[in-house]
A protein has these predicted regions:
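A membrane-topology feature that recognizes alpha-helical transmembrane segments
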Residues: 1-225
Length: 225
């Protein structure tokens, strides 16, 4: 069961309740008074807010479960890459499978795109393939010149997964927004990211910004995406 990372004492069930446990303990372990990281209540609050908004827009439905699952997977990948420069292949592949399956069954994420009269399922597969090959090609050219990799393999599969969800036409704006986001992440901690960039975390932020801009029609009079 969960325990305090400082004194190793087990946490009571009532104190494991999201947000309530943190408030009840006043932000400290009840056994050793070690401050509890603010990341815990932040994570809990973030997922609560996202869950409420998903249900508000899509109701209590299978679609809500799928959308929240996509968010949860992206959140885990974001944190892992940000802290450890690690993007598990299993989660990345699951994201791609989820994107292709959802677009094939529900026709929801990329139903406004018309390329050669392709259906959502075909566009999802095309987005997956284009996402993978685009970053793979960039890294291949970089490797020919420098004799070393410039982009991690996990980033290829992650970008492919994002393409399977949003479609091939979304890849360019996601990459642009993701690159800017990755740059901002590096600027916030130059010491940690001096030799390696969490591109995956940046791409995930770029995807989220893209979704907000497109589906909530932000900047609709300025850009068309």
């Amino acid at each position: 069961r969960s325990h305090c990372t400082h004194c190793k004492k087990q946490i009571s069930l009532i104190n494991l309740i999201p947000l309530i446990g943190f408030i009840k303990q006043r932000g400290k372990c009840k056994n050793c008074d070690e401050p509890i990281s603010l990341m815990y209540p932040f994570n809990e609050l973030l997922h609560l807010v996202v869950g409420i908004h998903v249900i508000y827009f899509f109701g209590i439905s299978l679609m809500s479960i799928i959308i929240y699952t996509i968010f949860f997977v992206l959140y885990v990948l974001f944190i892992l890459d940000l802290k450890h420069f690690y993007l598990p292949i299993g989660l990345n592949i699951f994201l791609g499978v989820l994107g292709i399956t959802t677009n094939s069954i529900f026709d929801v994420f990329i139903n406004d795109i018309d390329i050669l009269n392709l259906g959502s399922a075909s566009l999802s597969i095309l987005g997956y393939s284009a996402g993978f090959l685009s970053l793979w090609t960039v890294n291949f050219i970089y490797r020919l010149i420098t004799k070393k990799d410039g982009i991690g393999g996990g980033d290829f599969i992650l970008f492919a997964g994002l393409g399977s969800i949003a479609g091939p036409l979304a890849l360019a704006p996601i990459l642009f927004l993701g690159s800017l986001s990755a740059l901002l992440i590096v600027i916030t901690n130059l010491k940690k990211y001096s030799n390696e960039v969490p591109l995956g975390s940046g791409l995930i932020l770029g995807f989220i910004f893209y979704v907000l801009l497109k589906y909530f029609e932000l900047l609709v009079n300025i850009v068309v995406i």
